[in-house]
Amino acid sequence: HSETAELVMLLQEEIVFEEYYRCYCIGGKYVRIMPYEPRNPFHLRYVADFSPSQEKLKEMQEIVLRINKYLGYDFNTVELALRDGVPYAIDFCNPAPDADINSVGQENFDWVVETAATYMIEKAQANQPGRDNLTWGEYIKRSSAGAERLMP
């Protein structure tokens, strides 16, 4: 607290984890789950040998999709730490996440570029002129619905 002064911070329990994953989510439907080791030097963070089961991958994908649907982010990363097999969302508000080829690696970079292009084409094709074509998350929808009730 003494170092952040007036900055808004999210206080979280420290999760001493066995596995850690960084998950891209694009368009609220495309998810890439990447083993990630945040304790490694920067250039080696995507060099992690975690191997989740298909069931755990599905659970993590559902968590990532749920968070992004609620926030309404078109592009985000969610970091999940697994402790005793339970995924904890650690960092999940990254609407402009790092996708630099030098940090995420060629394979992950290629996925981001291809998937973002696919999503942008879908959005362009679905565009309805004169209408609100933005992605509004459940958080904003619910908040604005409550604000409407307060208006005279």
Per-region residue spans from a language model:
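Phosphate-binding site of ATP-dependent enzymes
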Residues: 1-71
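Protein kinase-like catalytic core scaffold
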Residues: 32, 76, 88-91
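Hydrophobic residue at the +6 position relative to the catalytic HRD Asp in the kinase catalytic loop
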Residues: 78-80
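C-terminal active-site "lid" helix and adjoining low-complexity regulatory extension at the edge
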Residues: 82-152
